[in-house]
Amino acid sequence: MAHKKGVGSSKNGRESESKRLGVKIFGGQAAIAGNIIVRQRGSKHNPGENVYMGKDHTLHARVAGLVKFQKKGENKSYVSVVAFEA
């Protein structure tokens, strides 16, 4: 019996768990207040009207409505929620 581990065994097993990032509610779909619209690292998408950004850069709907994505300028993407009529 070996008194030390095999050489390769301790060098394996570092695969990290996926973080499930990305768009959760797409443009034209309905969101209710508090729904997660985009989970991201950094501000790839910026908050527009009726959207706020959490401390981990996640975008949430502030009100119920339809999600709208739009580009402004070269590479600025904004996500907004168009509120439903009352």
Curated annotation (Swiss-Prot):
It comes from the Bacteria. GO terms for biological process: translation. One of its GO terms (cellular component) is cytosolic large ribosomal subunit. It holds the Pfam family Ribosomal_L27. PROSITE patterns: RIBOSOMAL_L27 (PS00831). Keywords: Ribonucleoprotein, Ribosomal protein. InterPro entries: Ribosomal_bL27 (IPR001684), Ribosomal_bL27_CS (IPR018261). The keyword Lipoprotein does not apply. GO terms for molecular function: structural constituent of ribosome. HAMAP family: Ribosomal_bL27. Belongs to the bacterial ribosomal protein bL27 family. This is Large ribosomal subunit protein bL27. It comes from Flavobacterium psychrophilum (strain ATCC 49511 / DSM 21280 / CIP 103535 / JIP02/86). The gene is rpmA.
